[in-house]
């Protein structure tokens, strides 16, 4: 009796175990095939992947182009993709050698010890095929070799502005918690426009070339490779930026060759209020996390000490408040406080001469007089010149009311505390762009563009529009005006004249620009940084003076070099623009 009971219990246990195993098998094979375990593993995909050898041609993420439709940050290269696990015979190698002109031994060497598909290289770069070579390779129907265009990343123009992408599972979940089917390896935008426009750029699926193989690694469906893609006519999208690639490349070349370690330049289209070129140094370092964190900041969107460029704000305020008399002279032999001799003895100068030669004492005196009238006057006129708040395009974009194109941009600072507004020395330092004053190069460029437009303030665009894959328009960014006070026409005209005198006066700080093919108006600046002997050197201006088309800011930040790199960069860039315009 006991024996029968034991047998029954044993059989029951076996039956339960079998039921559990069958249940688990049913879960794997029938129920949870597309979302297995807490990690939501797609078992069907994994099964296909196991017997598939694939090479990704396009990750499916949206891409950026310049204002003329030229690619930024990536190119499509016609290359030879080799699947080394497939047995490529010698006669096939001879055939491919004859078509592309690469010795068979070189190809064999690259195939050695490789199991995954790869692109044939020449040195450290992909071997690029001609259109004719591509057609011949594919007509030859060689097992394991495919000639095709592949989307490849390259050193990006405007790398800080465009931004970088990467894997970040925590950030992915935070941004897209409702999209449960996203893989934890999904690429997202980490910085720049890649981050701002991430939800529009997200991949809808990869485009691949592949072979499906049996357990011996032999192709199941013959010699021809197969192609897979999402087949969506609308995605991925194209983001058309306002950048002009040729000018961007020239800007990067100038900043690099003149050795700016920290700083860069911003070029704006005055009439359209668009970024034409933007360079930030130091360059992005993607080698390791620490190096990236040190170089990730876009210096053109970050506020810095503006030095004497800020005198433009004081000048506008003084003119607008009828404080300028042509006969009034200022003692420019003293320091800003009127206590000691100045490092540069300029003698007695009137207001116009003081601006052209950048006399600190004049603007310290005017700043003090302005503050006696109104404790908020400096902030008021910085706003009137379009430089106090963030100046990048922002507004309604579909369901997002506060969408910002330039997500990393920071607004200007004039005062860190109200107590400084009553101290004469603090006021003097502030009036010459020191103390707590910080303004980004982009905001200063927008100030120059505002002056060039006779006081009309606008937000600055980095992106014109988004287009679907089929070329139709998805979203267009309309021009936006900056709200708030504007300078009177009369005041702006006088400020324009002052900026021009910086160049035309014999001893003006911009006199070296007199010989340029396009007439320039602008203001130089040198700011103490509080870091030993390091200074910020600036030149901000617009051109041509008679019919302004561009506003340009060049800045060398925290430099201890005796050599002024800002002036030659500004000069050579204006010459390049004049040359390009002459060819159009």
Go through each PLM region and give its residues:
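Bateman (tandem CBS) regulatory domains
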Residues: 231-237, 293-300
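Extracytoplasmic Gram-positive cell-surface binding/anchoring modules and repeats
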Residues: 303
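Beta-lactam-recognizing serine transpeptidase/beta-lactamase-like catalytic domain environment
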Residues: 60, 269-299, 307, 316, ...
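Periplasmic/cell-envelope proteins involved in peptidoglycan metabolism and beta-lactam response
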Residues: 1-287, 379-384, 557-584
């Amino acid at each position: 009796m006991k024996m029968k009971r034991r047998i029954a219990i044993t059989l029951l246990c076996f039956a339960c175990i079998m039921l559990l195993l069958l249940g688990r098998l049913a879960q794997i094979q029938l129920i949870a095939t597309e979302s297995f375990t807490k990690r939501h593993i797609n078992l069907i995909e994994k099964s296909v992947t196991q017997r598939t050898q694939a090479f990704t041609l396009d990750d499916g993420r949206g891409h950026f182009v310049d204002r003329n439709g030229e690619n930024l940050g990536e190119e499509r290269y016609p290359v030879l993709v080799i699947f080394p696990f497939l047995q490529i015979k010698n006669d096939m190698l001879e055939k491919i050698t004859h078509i592309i002109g690469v010795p068979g031994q070189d190809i064999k060497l690259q195939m050695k010890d490789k199991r995954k598909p790869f692109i044939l290289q020449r040195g450290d770069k992909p071997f690029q095929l001609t259109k004719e070579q591509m057609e011949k390779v594919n007509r030859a129907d060689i097992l394991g070799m495919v000639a095709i265009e592949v989307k490849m990343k390259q050193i990006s123009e405007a790398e800080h502005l465009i931004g970088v992408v990467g894997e970040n599972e925590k950030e992915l979940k935070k941004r897209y918690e409702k999209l449960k089917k996203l893989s934890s390896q999904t690429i997202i935008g980490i910085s720049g426009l890649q981050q701002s426009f991430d939800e529009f750029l997200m991949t809808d699926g990869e485009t691949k070339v592949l072979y499906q193989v049996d357990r011996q690694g032999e192709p199941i469906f013959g010699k021809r490779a197969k192609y897979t893609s999402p087949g969506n006519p609308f995605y991925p999208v194209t983001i058309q930026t306002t950048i002009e690639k040729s000018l961007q490349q020239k800007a990067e070349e100038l900043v690099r060759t003149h050795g700016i370690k920290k700083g860069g330049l911003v070029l704006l289209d005055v009439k359209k209020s668009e970024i034409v070129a933007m360079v930030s140094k130091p360059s992005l370092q993607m080698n390791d996390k620490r190096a990236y964190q040190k170089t990730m900041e876009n210096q053109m969107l970050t506020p810095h000490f503006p030095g004497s460029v800020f005198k433009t704000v004081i000048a506008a305020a003084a003119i607008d408040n009828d404080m300028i008399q042509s006969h009034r002279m200022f003692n420019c032999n003293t320091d800003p406080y009127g206590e000691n001799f100045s490092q540069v003895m300029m003698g007695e100068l009137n207001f116009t001469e003081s601006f052209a030669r950048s006399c600190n004492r004049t603007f310290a005196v005017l700043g003090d007089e302005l503050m006696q009238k109104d404790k908020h006057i400096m902030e008021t006129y910085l706003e009137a010149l379009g430089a106090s708040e963030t100046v990048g395009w922002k507004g309604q974009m579909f369901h997002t009311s506060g969408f910002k194109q330039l997500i990393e941009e920071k607004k200007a600072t004039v005062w860190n505390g109200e107590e400084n507004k009553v101290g004469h020395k603090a006021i003097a330092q502030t009036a010459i762009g020191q103390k707590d004053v910080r303004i980004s190069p982009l905001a200063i460029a927008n100030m120059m563009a505002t002056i060039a437009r006779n006081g009309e303030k606008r937000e600055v665009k980095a992106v014109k529009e988004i287009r679907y894959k089929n070329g139709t328009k998805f979203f267009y960014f309309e021009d936006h005006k900056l709200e708030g006070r504007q300078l009177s026409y009369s005041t702006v005209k006088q400020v324009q004249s002052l900026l021009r005198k910086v160049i035309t006066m014999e001893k003006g700080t911009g006199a070296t620009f007199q010989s340029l093919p396009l007439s320039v108006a602008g203001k130089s600046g040198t700011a103490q940084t509080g870091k030993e002997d390091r200074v910020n050197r600036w030149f901000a201006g617009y051109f041509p003076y008679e019919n302004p088309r561009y506003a340009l800011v060049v800045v060398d930040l925290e430099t201890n070099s005796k050599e002024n790199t800002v002036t030659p960069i500004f000069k050579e860039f204006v010459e390049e623009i004049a040359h390009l315009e002459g060819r159009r």
